[in-house]
């Protein structure tokens, strides 16, 4: 009886089959975001090529994505403007959350360079995009009554040792009449 089969191994867990390395969740999301942006450029009127894309086109894309948002952002004239938990529904629009837009821009910025775009011409890192994201963050924070202030690092405050006044320090450092410089160092007195 032949124990070794001469047929190809059909076991999916076998080490003889080559499987492509599984991509991380981040890489998959980055690829989907990149494909969505490229499709947006193709559907743009007139169609845009990637090298001709600028920060203004990225802003158009972000505004386009706003229609698919799920975050309620109150208008300034809404009665619930500035309330973190409004007590009733209102007609204010649903928008993309700032955190989602910020993460999206980060992924697209990386994807642009991975797909051959020069870092110095990256439209996702343009000043206009950075300013837009900052404005969205600040407005959404005001609309919800939440602040996004940067947390400052805590300074490790140790209680400073009290030091004698400068004149007293200088007097202690000068050798007394008849003492050597080493007398203060060793703690010996003459």
From Swiss-Prot:
Motif (Nuclear localization signal): 150-154
Tissue: Expressed in hypocotyls, shoot apices and lateral root primordia and, weakly, in vascular tissues.
Keywords, alphabetical: Developmental protein, DNA-binding, Nucleus, Transcription, Transcription regulation
Compositionally biased residues, Low complexity: 158-179
GO cellular component: nucleus
UniProt-annotated stretches for the region Disordered: 1-28, 145-190
Keyword Nucleus among UniProt keywords: yes
Family of the protein in this entry: Belongs to the plant homeotic and developmental regulators ALOG protein family.
Role noted for this protein: Probable transcription regulator that acts as a developmental regulator by promoting cell growth in response to continuous red (cR), far-red (cFR) and blue (cB) light in a phytochrome-dependent manner, at least during seedling development.
Protein name per the record: Protein LIGHT-DEPENDENT SHORT HYPOCOTYLS 1
Originating species: Arabidopsis thaliana (Mouse-ear cress)
Name of encoding gene: LSH1
């Amino acid at each position: 009886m032949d124990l070794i089969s001469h047929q190809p191994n059909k076991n999916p867990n076998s080490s003889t089959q080559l499987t492509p390395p599984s991509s991380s969740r981040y890489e998959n999301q980055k690829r989907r975001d990149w494909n969505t942006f490229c499709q947006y450029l193709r559907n743009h009127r007139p169609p845009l090529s990637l090298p001709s894309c600028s920060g203004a086109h990225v802003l158009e894309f972000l505004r386009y994505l706003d229609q698919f948002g799920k975050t309620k952002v109150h208008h300034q004239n809404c009665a619930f403007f500035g309330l973190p938990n409004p007590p009733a529904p209102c007609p204010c629009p649903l928008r993309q959350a700032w955190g989602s837009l910020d993460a999206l821009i980060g992924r697209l910025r990386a994807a642009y360079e991975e797909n051959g775009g020069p870092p110095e011409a990256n439209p996702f890192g343009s000043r206009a995009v950075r300013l837009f994201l900052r404005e969205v963050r600040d407005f959404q924070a005001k609309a919800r009554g939440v602040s996004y202030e940067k947390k400052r690092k805590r300074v490790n405050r140790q209680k400073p040792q009290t030091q004698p006044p400068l004149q007293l320090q200088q007097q202690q450092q000068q050798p007394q009449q008849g003492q050597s410089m080493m007398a203060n160092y060793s703690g010996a007195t003459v």
